[in-house]
Amino acid sequence: MDVEQFVGQCWDVLHGEGTPLEGCPLEESDAQAEAQRRFPNKPHCLIRQWSRITLECEPETLAYLASVGLRAAVIFAHQVVFDSANRCPPGSWIRSTYEVSWDMAGFFESKHTVYVLLGPGVQKTAPLRAVLAIH
């Protein structure tokens, strides 16, 4: 793959179209309270303009992730609304680590954080290499 193709893949991760999904229907304060109730021992991050990205990766990578309780998917968001651990200021972007759980109610859990997916978002698929290049 040449550089132009790789840059195109990275652009698609950030700005490409995907299948529309609805996020958490709750207001921000209610969503924050629900995250604390459902995941009391994890920091939470409320986000908007998000994508749930299923990663295209080698079978060995999929097997390894499954063996440690993870799935080949991440969240990318263009807008952090609130981060309970104060890692990201409001308005910044964020990319999660691998998925532990996800439900259609708008809660995506990674190993260390719960992401509350506010408003509409998209589901897309992208190569692992392109997603990991965004940091």
Where in this protein do the model-derived segments appear?
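Amphipathic alpha-helical packing elements
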Residues: A105-G119
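N-terminal non-globular leader segments, chiefly Sec-dependent signal peptides
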Residues: M1-W102, P120-H135
